[in-house]
């Protein structure tokens, strides 16, 4: 459980003081979903800046320059990777064609280790599941709707991604985790957070009383929304991954039945597990990779049938 937050001041109506007040209020409110680390990404002076530390957001007192109009942020609740290492905090930096981008993720990815093997991704000291999304984008050598769609359809688990590219386009890739986005058309401002309660709390705490009567911009699971630095929106979609079907019941005969624990012998059981995995679109190599990573046969079987390890 982490939190995404940020804003787009596309009409440049906020003063420097107002921007920083809003940023800090959102970041502090986002601590509700994580205090292990916090970070932000933004452009200034013609380059991407990422500030992140393994500390709660309120301690960091984020500050951005007046020229910055788009900022994305993240508070971390560590689930994978050393919580004390700043390089495991979000946002992460990537690079495509000499241009840097930033990515943050709320959720848990279950197949990052499989993707490292199957996609031949480079080794990294970063220990989080989220970083695989950066590597997948870099491998495609493109950052656009098509490349984001492919990543969203490759990963397994829960997610909302925010991605800031070199042109100050902010992408929202909406999986099955929460996201709340407000638009203030009169002021020319978008503000977002992972939940409505956090967003409302951050706005109230900012003291920016002129931010009233927002229009909620709805996004659903399977949506990819891009907002450019001028406030223009474009929406595309990805296929919602169907890797995790309902657990088997007698009423659903087309899903293969779980193997009985009472009749297992180790070799035969692993062979059966490989056969069952093929019904879900996974190769023998995928199962052997999970086994080599230390997952037990029971854990892999749970993953296949219920999406849980």
Predicted regions and their residues:
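Conserved short alpha-helical segments that host acidic/polar catalytic motifs at enzyme active sites
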Residues: 1-309
């Amino acid at each position: 459980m982490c939190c995404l937050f940020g804003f787009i001041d596309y009409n440049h109506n906020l003063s420097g003081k107002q921007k920083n007040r809003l940023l800090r209020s959102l970041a502090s409110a986002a601590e509700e979903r994580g205090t292990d680390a916090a970070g932000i990404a933004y452009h200034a002076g013609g380059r991407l800046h990422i500030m992140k530390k393994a500390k709660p957001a309120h301690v960091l007192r984020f500050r951005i320059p007046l020229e910055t109009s788009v900022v994305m942020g993240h508070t971390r609740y560590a689930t994978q990777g050393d919580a004390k290492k700043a390089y495991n905090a979000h946002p992460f930096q990537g690079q495509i064609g000499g241009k840097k981008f930033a990515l943050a993720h709320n959720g848990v990815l279950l197949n990052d280790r499989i993707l490292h093997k199957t996609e031949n991704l480079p080794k990294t000291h970063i220990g989080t599941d989220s970083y695989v999304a950066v590597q997948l984008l870099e491998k495609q050598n493109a950052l656009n709707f098509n490349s984001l769609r492919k990543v969203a359809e490759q990963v397994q688990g829960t997610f909302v991604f925010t991605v800031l590219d070199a042109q100050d386009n902010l992408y929202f890739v909406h999986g099955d985790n929460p996201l709340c986005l407000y638009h203030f058309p009169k002021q020319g401002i978008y503000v977002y957070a992972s939940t409505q309660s956090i967003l409302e709390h951050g706005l109230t705490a900012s003291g920016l009383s002129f931010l009233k009567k927002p229009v909620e911009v709805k996004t659903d699971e399977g949506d990819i929304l891009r907002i450019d630095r001028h406030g223009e929106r474009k929406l595309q979609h990805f296929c919602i991954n169907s890797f995790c079907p309902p657990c088997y019941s007698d009423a659903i005969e087309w899903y293969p039945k779980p193997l009985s624990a009472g009749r297992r012998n180790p070799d035969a059981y692993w062979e059966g597990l490989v056969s069952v995995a093929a019904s879900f679109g996974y190769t023998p190599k995928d199962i052997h990779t999970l086994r080599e990573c230390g997952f037990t046969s029971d854990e892999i079987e749970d993953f296949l049938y219920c999406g849980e390890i």
